[in-house]
Amino acid sequence: PVSGRDLMLAVDLSDSMRTGDFVIEDEQVNRLQATKVVASQFIERRHGDRLGLILFGTQAYLQAPLTFDGETVNRLLQESAIGLAGERTAIGDAIGLAIKRLDLESDNSKVLVLMTDGANTAGEVTPLKAAQIAADRGLRIYTIGIGADEQIETTWFGLRRSNPSAQLDEESLRQIAALSGGRYFRARDSEALARIYEILDELEPVQRDLENLRPVVALFVWPLAGALLLAGLLLLPWRRS
């Protein structure tokens, strides 16, 4: 048998993810760019796992249902953009959507890795209520709070120090993880983020039969991408003939 699990990634696309407080290869990047680089490496290492992708902002969308096709999941992550799901942060709804999708499976180990840089400011369900339901359904949640604690900016009055992560609700993220039997991680820079994903690699796997692990190319429809394309076309100005 081959080890594996059902693992859903939930990535915050709210407006604050454009904050440029990370550095990768001596280049300053925003939080989503750093997430894409590190999570891409994580996805490539998940041989034998079924992976899924949820993108959330004001609303939560299932961008990739569970699949062995990690290449497609990675591509969809790389194509994501800040603001596509709205400017606010629906953490509870993202957890609820993961519960709904992962609950379709009964015997597999279920894991959600949720990354955010803020607090729950939108959605229909509170994060703690969603976390309790997740625990009841056997879904383990690992939460990652992303963002530096200090940023130095140049202003007309000289250098100014600020905390770009002032809105991060670490206490809620800790409670979400604790309720579901997971763990909370704090990623203040790209190195810490990479170490977190290495720790996640050590999650205990479930056993699967080899016959269930044949490579599959995902052919599912991408509803969020289609909806965004349609919205873009509708916003194009009409020209008079």
Model-found features: residue ranges?
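Short acidic, Gly/Ser-rich segments with clustered Asp/Glu that frequently serve as metal-coordination loops
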Residues: 13-22, 119-122
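VWA/integrin I-like adhesion module and closely mimicked acidic/polar interface patches used
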Residues: 86-89, 100, 109-111, 118-179, ...
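C-terminal signal-anchor/stop-transfer transmembrane helix together with its immediate cytosolic
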Residues: 1-2, 205-241
